Amino acid sequence: MTIAEQVATIAKNARQASIALARLSTTVKNEMLLKMADALEAGTTGLMCENAKDLAAGKEKGLSDAMLDRLMLDAKRIKGMADALREVASLADPVGEVTRMWKRPNGLMVGKMRIPLGVIGIVYESRPNVTADAAALCLKSGNAVVLRGGSEAIHSNRAIAATLQGVMKELGIPEAALSLIPFTEREGVLEMLKQEELIDLIIPRGGESLIRFVVENSRIPVIKHYKGVCHLFVDASADFEMATRIIINAKTQRPGVCNALETLLIHKDVAATFIPPFAKSLGELQVELRGDEEFRKYAPAAKVATEEDWAAEYLELILACKVVDDMDAAIDHINQYGSLHSEVIVTRDYANAQRFIREVNSSCVLVNASTRFNDGGQLGLGAEIGISTTKLHSFGPMGLEDLTTTKFIVYGDGQVRA
C-alpha cells in the first residue's frame, strides 16, 4: 500500500476503535493506564536501546545538545513517563458527567452531558515522552488517538507505542485506539491532515514552523499551542522587590518553556528608580537585556532592542525591555505583539489590576504572580496536553475536560410538540 492508503487505513481503524473506547468504564480505563505505567518501567532497558538509535542518528545529523537532551530517554525520564500515566489515572473522568440540568415548563428535563470528541490527531516534535503523555490523556477522556512524532524520535516513539498497545491487547481494548503514523516522510503528516471524515481534531505540539505547517495544510480543525511571547508590566504602584522576584522566576527558572517571560514593560514614572537595581540583578544571573532607548538610559549595558525583539520567543536567557507611558500603552503593546499566552501585571492598585484582567485577552492573565503558573498542574487542572492559544474550542491549559464536548440529553414523560 502507498503511504496515503496506509494513513487512511490507520484513521479508519482509529475511528472504529473510538466507538468501543467511548463505552469503557472509568475503572477499566484506569486499570489500563496503571498497567501501561508498569509496562513502561518494566521495559526500561528496551526503550533505552531504541532511544540510543535515535540519539546516534541525531548526532550524525548534527542536532544541537539541547535537541539531543530533549530526545534522550534514561531510566529517570521513563519513570517520569510512567508516573505521568499514574497521575492521569488518578484524575476524575469527565466522560458522562452531566454539567447542567433544567426543567422546561412542559415538564421536560434538559441537560448537558460530557462525551469524548472521537479521534484526536497529535503532531509533535522531538520529545518522545509526548507519545505516552498524549496517549494517556486522550484514552482517559475516551478518545482514540493518532500520533505522528518527529522523525528524529521514530525508534523511541515506536517502542513506547508498542509497549502501550501491548497492554491494550492484554485487556481486550482495540489497539487501533492508540495508533502511531510509522513514516518519517512529510507525506505521512500531509495525508493525516486530510482525514477530515475520520479525525475530529488536530493538536500540534512543537515549534512555530511546525504549527504553521499544520494550520496551513489541515482540513481538520486545529487547536494551536502557539509560541509563548509572555509579558510582565511593572505598574507605577508596583512593589519593586516583588516585581524583581517575579521577573527572575518567570525568566530564569526554566527559560526554554512556553510560559517563560520574554518581554518586560515598565511604567515611565518608575523607570529611573526600578531599572538600575533590576538590571544589576538580572545581569548577575547572566540574563541578556535588550532595551528601547528609554530603558537604556537607565541600563546602558543593555543591547539595543529591534522590532523583531518585541515578537520574539527567545526560550533562552534574553529579555526584551521597554518603558511605556502608561497602562494604555502597555496593553496596546501586548495586544500588538503578544501570542495570547500569559501576561502579568505587578501592581498595588486594585482598579488597575481589574482593568488589566478585563482588557488583556490572553489565555492566562495574572496579578502579582509569575507567568510560570500558566500550567495545568499549577492551576489545579491536573495533567495537560498543552496550552492552547486558540479561543475555539479550548483556551489555556488543556486537561481531560477540554478533550471532551457536550451533548444534550432530554428526559420526557410522553411529551409531544404542539
UniProtKB/Swiss-Prot annotation:
Swiss-Prot/TrEMBL keywords: Amino-acid biosynthesis, Cytoplasm, NADP, Oxidoreductase, Proline biosynthesis
**Could you say which protein family the record assigns here?**
Belongs to the gamma-glutamyl phosphate reductase family.
Q: Alphabetically, which GO biological process terms does the record hold?
A: L-proline biosynthetic process
Question: What is the catalytic activity of this protein?
Answer: L-glutamate 5-semialdehyde + phosphate + NADP(+) = L-glutamyl 5-phosphate + NADPH + H(+)
The record, for Pfam families, names: Aldedh (PF00171)
Write out the pathway annotation from the protein's UniProt entry. Answer: Amino-acid biosynthesis; L-proline biosynthesis; L-glutamate 5-semialdehyde from L-glutamate: step 2/2
Q: What is this protein called?
A: Gamma-glutamyl phosphate reductase
Q: Which PANTHER family match?
A: DELTA-1-PYRROLINE-5-CARBOXYLATE SYNTHASE (PTHR11063:SF8), GLUTAMATE SEMIALDEHYDE DEHYDROGENASE (PTHR11063)
Would you say which domain of life the source belongs to? Answer: Bacteria
Q: Which GO terms describe its molecular function?
A: glutamate-5-semialdehyde dehydrogenase activity; NADP binding
Supply the EC number(s): 1.2.1.41
* Entry's Gene Ontology cellular component terms: cytoplasm
- Compartments reported by the entry: Cytoplasm
Give a short account of what the protein does: Catalyzes the NADPH-dependent reduction of L-glutamate 5-phosphate into L-glutamate 5-semialdehyde and phosphate. The product spontaneously undergoes cyclization to form 1-pyrroline-5-carboxylate.
Family matches, as InterPro entries: Ald_DH/histidinol_DH (IPR016161), Ald_DH_C (IPR016163), Ald_DH_N (IPR016162), Aldehyde_DH_dom (IPR015590), G-glutamylP_reductase_CS (IPR020593), Glu-5-SA_DH (IPR012134), GPR_dom (IPR000965)
Protein source organism: Trichlorobacter lovleyi (strain ATCC BAA-1151 / DSM 17278 / SZ)
